[in-house]
Amino acid sequence: MKPKSVSEIREIFLNYFKDKSHNVVPSSSLLPAGDPTLLFTTAGMVQFKPLFTGAVELPYTRATSCQKCLRTTDLEVVGKTERHCTFFEMLGNFSFGDYFKEEAIEYALDCSVNHFGFDKNKIWVTVYTDDDEAEKIWLSKGIPKERITRLGKKDNFWGPAGDSGACGPCSELYLDRGIEKGGPNCATSGTCKPGCDCDRFLEFWNIVFNQFNQDTEGNLHPLKQTGIDTGSGLERVALLLQEVDSVYDTNELRKIISFYEELSGISYEDKTLSEISEKKNNNQQISSQVRNETKSIQDSRKTAFRVVTDHIRSVLFSIGDGIYPDRTGRGYVIRRLIRRATLFGRKLNFKEPFLYKLVDKVIEIYKARYPELQRNAAAITKTILVEEELFLKTLELGLEKIESLVQKTKAGGKTIFSGADAFLLYGTYGFPAEMTEEIVAEQGLDFDKKGFQEELEKDRQFSRESWKVNKVSLMTGLNVDKTEFLGYSSVSGKGNITHLFYNSPKSSNSLSQVDSKLQSSTPAGTGSYDSKQVSSLKEGQAGAIVLNKTPFYPEGGGQVGDIGFLRQGKNVFKVFDTQKENDSIIHFGEVLSGEFIVSQELEAEVEITRRERLKFHHSGTHLLNGALRTLLGDHVLQKGSIVSPEYLRFDFSHPSSLTSEEIRQIESWVNESIRKNFPVETKELSIEDAKKTGAVATFGEKYGERVRVVQMGDASIEFCGGTHVSRTGEIGYFFIKKESSPGAGNRRIEGVCGPAVIETFQNRFSELTESVQNLNLKIKSELGEEGTKILILSFIPGPDEIREKLEKEGASAVSFFRDLSENIATKIEENTSSFLKIKKNLAERDFENNTSVIENVLASSVDTGIGKIVSAIFEDKDPNSLKGLSDNLKVREKNLLVILGSRNSENASIVITCSSELTLKGIHCGNLIKTACELLGGKGGGRPDMAQGGGKEKQNLESAIAGVINEAKQILTGERV
């Protein structure tokens, strides 16, 4: 009987291989460890890469797993085809130097037919184009030759996952689903076989015969031990066994779709659509139109259901593994998935945040297998909600903008959507370039990827610091009341416009560079832009808005300014930066839609996640200052600071660099203050009363009559106007990344707080893992048994272990990870040195004992009648190697004088030795070496039977050796040469 549920299929597979003596290994994180070339875990073999290459000791030789995977290579077709997903589970069985082709093929066929219940007569297989062995095995298992297809490297040579690692030819199993599944994509009208683009044959099992290790330059090297890496997509197997049309119709994914059906009130299989029902039955022509429109809307909605179903899984599992939405890297991919799901959600009439509402229901499906989802449910829900809210603020406006840009492109007779327009949508409306590409493709336009990248690069080149020095003094000469700051207690609030400024470009009006324009503002007449006070700002205009009240924190006290939105109905202003001039808070940005006029009341909304990280780092900076003054002394004065969402930087007066122990003590002091969870109390006092509290003032800072004092228990009390946490425990953890000097008499500390600590350690240990694996591979491949003692077998935590330990133990785990990372780094350095030393010794030993070298040198001998003289010149050999070779030469030949030289990039060295018999004939190596060293411009000396020396004049090495030979001949024969 065929298994029906996804859960049953998973357990049947794992139990099958468990019975075949495979270790059942839990799924690793979606955040891959030790491979910076991979953004995500994309295959089951990723966690086993070092086992295949031999970079680590084998804990077992057989393994099986069900691995959570994330791939976005086919993102644009996800939801539109029956089999593509971004998130999926990969069933796999693995052999590390144990079984190979015969058993792997046997297991695959046996499990497929006798345990999954597939009809053997419907199974086809593919093999690599020249893999006769695999074909022979399949034939022996009863698969006829007509159901075996040979395919090339594109289809049947797999790997590696990432830029390097194990790889090899593969063999795949396909199920023949019948001619009727061929469809319009079948080029042979039903006589096709695997390799055809149609849907008749669906691949459900891939066996990779790992025989090679690919390096980062793409070169293949034979593996010392072969291996097996199989992958069987759980969702695909379920599709075939449940005999449904797509992976989205399998039981677990269909259940998620049902949640969205309930939430939207729209049926996934809707056959009657209200939008067109009024047209039906009027006449045959309209009836045909009705059918076409009905199918179009049905297909569109079905795609939307599939997209949101797939993407919620990807996002949920990623955040559960600590991968949060961000502007770059992995986080950018997650943000992109949320935004794509939000976009498709509109086709299901979702105009408000909706993805977050079903997090708990989706977790319910998977929590037994993946308990980390339940543990992180609150964080997942909150993160998705914040991301949805952020994107929805500009989505409607962005869609309107993209429509107008598409029409402009078409009206101009163009077929390519420009990179500049795409960058405008990216920078201003938050549209990922890939999403824009997908939207314009539906409108029949190509996408200018190169142009977009060029615009992105231009934007990166603008320095944030460069504009502030020359920033327009907007408020000079104006009678302006003080802006009331609301941001200490809220990230949103209402305020009225008191002043508007328009930033007009003199030479360019490209909206795609609006952020850079604002950041490059200069006084009128001295740069490319003019800023002037106006009564209104209209759509597309860059400028600045001053409110009488705002929750936006202006840059000050080291803390960067807030970003976010100002809005009133459909009037939307995107804030790129917030600054303060005199007592006025100025919001710099661009009007995305509508118009803004003086006195208008606006809703001000600060970007929450960014503000949270700023609070962590600002409060962490105060604790750091407290630690420095407590542990180093009261001479410590703050000389400057930067508080950003990503990190903190603190400059302070101190005469010498900090020792490792001092850094450790400072870090521990801050983390202990975090652990104590002090309340963060603020008071506004007169300057005199504030000084009496002992509050620390920033050196050189000017203060008014009244100041704000921030106190954190007995750990810190400072003058500060910035935003902070409510209790120190909210900071989570603190880690010092770097200590350096910004100038004489001052020191600088760069550190991270909160989630940034987790990310820092994950990145650091990933780099260490890669370094250890690469070193171990070198040791094994180049030293063999000689290198066994210097293999690094230290425990290195993976991304999940790092996050879980920090979340469980808090700040105390920071010291553990600091010590561990430093110990591993030291071990790498020491063992690298040992590796090079052993490698050199082996090379010297091989050189000294090389029969061919010995024979060649002896062949050049000069017989004086009393003794023989041999000489040779080598490259990059040290004196010890030359001495070793000399000894072996003297073993082979009696009455021998040996003169050996070597050159490297800087100098030349020379070694002279002789048999004891020749010393009795007047040869003194110590005297001969002096003759040579004079020509080499150096020094030398030694005993009668052995001497060495060298010099910088390496070009004279041949002449030096010739001189020694001549002098030796004269001594031995009594004749002048």
UniProtKB/Swiss-Prot annotation:
Q: Where in the cell is it found?
A: Cytoplasm
User: Which Pfam family would be a valid example here?
Assistant: tRNA_SAD
Q: List all disulphide bridges recorded for this chain.
A: none
One MF term from GO for this chain?
A: tRNA binding
> Main localisation, per the record?
cytoplasm
Q: Region Disordered: start and end of each range?
A: 512-535
Protein name as catalogued: Alanine--tRNA ligase
Q: Please tell me the species this chain comes from.
A: Leptospira interrogans serogroup Icterohaemorrhagiae serovar Lai (strain 56601)
